A protein has these predicted regions:
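N-terminal Rossmann-like dinucleotide-binding module
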Residues: 2-3, 7, 12-55
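Internal anion-binding site segments
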Residues: 3, 210-263
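Conserved beta-strand segments of alpha/beta enzyme cores
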Residues: 18, 41, 72-74, 117
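Short beta->alpha connector loops
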Residues: 24-27, 79-82, 102-105
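Amphipathic, non-transmembrane alpha-helical secondary structure
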Residues: 29, 33-37, 87-91, 108, ...
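Donor/substrate-binding cores of folate-linked one-carbon enzymes
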Residues: 38-41, 48, 97-215, 222
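N-terminal glycine-/serine-/threonine-rich beta1-alpha1-beta2 phosphate-ribose binding loop
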Residues: 52-96
Length: 263
């Protein structure tokens, strides 16, 4: 990837840690590619099993799996994270650190395996927007900034002690897709900086302020219907917050459903 090569020029030093990378979608795959380009020792990638997609329902690998295989990195695809064979395979890797991006909730038996610990790269400034869809909800709720937080894993989702964070502005007409891409690049940089900091032992984990926490739950089709009775700015934020995926939906007079991506 040319973008990865360009981004890598500012950070050439690797942490020297043995890292297992957990992730699935493009957001995670870009970060994995960046870490590899910066010399990180990714000893394995963990992702979801291949899923049937398209008209022919052919099995398609995840974006993370494709990147890992292109670099000859072993791939683990557990269906159950508490499976004893999977946990044994992870333990044999003798990893220093787990890096988790847009993956499933890891049980304690898994995230406590590495010597240094396991950290997540989350697309919000925690404790705001804990949950599965932080990018969408930040825009829907009219926030003027977002960012990336890296934090140590704990049993409860997105509650662990913060390692690093960096914010970016959200432009008035910016869509979720555009913010996704901006945070994907920032997440790669901050993920690498987190690995460097962990290897040097110079990060000071900071407890999150739970009283300031907000949530960003998963978005379902029923959540995507536009309510035109709301103020224009709220409708505008709703449309761009769901653009391009899953898309804000309205119904025409003839019953046809239409996705609106801009307003």
């Amino acid at each position: 990837m040319s973008s990865t090569t360009m981004e890598s020029s500012g950070l050439k030093k690797s942490s020297g840690l043995k890292v297992v990378f957990f992730g699935t979608p493009e957001f995670a795959a870009h970060i994995l590619e960046y870490l590899i380009a910066n010399g990180e020792n990714i000893v394995a990638a963990v992702t979801i099993p291949d899923k049937p997609q398209g008209r022919g329902l052919k099995l398609r690998p995840s974006a993370v799996k494709l990147v890992a295989l292109s670099h000859n990195i072993p791939v683990l695809e557990p269906t159950k994270l508490r499976d004893s064979d999977f946990i044994e395979a992870l333990a044999k890797l003798d990893a220093d650190c787990f890096c988790v991006v847009a993956y499933r909730i890891l049980p304690r038996d898994v995230y406590t395996l590495p010597k240094i610990g396991a950290f997540n790269i989350h697309a919000s400034i925690l404790p705001k927007y804990r949950g599965a869809a932080p990018i969408n909800w930040a825009i829907i709720r009219g926030e003027t900034e977002s960012g990336i937080t890296t934090f140590l894993l704990e049993d409860k989702v997105d509650t662990g002690n913060v390692l690093l964070k960096e914010s970016v502005p959200i432009r008035p007409n910016e869509t979720a897709g555009e913010l996704h891409d901006a945070l994907m690049h920032l997440g790669a940089k901050l993920g690498h900086e987190t690995l460097l900091g962990l290897s040097l032992g110079n990060l000071a984990p900071k407890k999150q302020l739970d009283t300031a926490a907000t949530t960003a739950p998963k978005i379902f089709p029923a959540d995507c219907i536009i309510d035109f009775s709301k103020p224009a700015i709220e409708v505008h934020n709703f449309i761009r917050g769901l653009s391009p995926h899953p898309g804000a939906i309205t119904t025409l007079h003839n019953g046809a459903k239409v996705k609106l991506l801009r307003s």
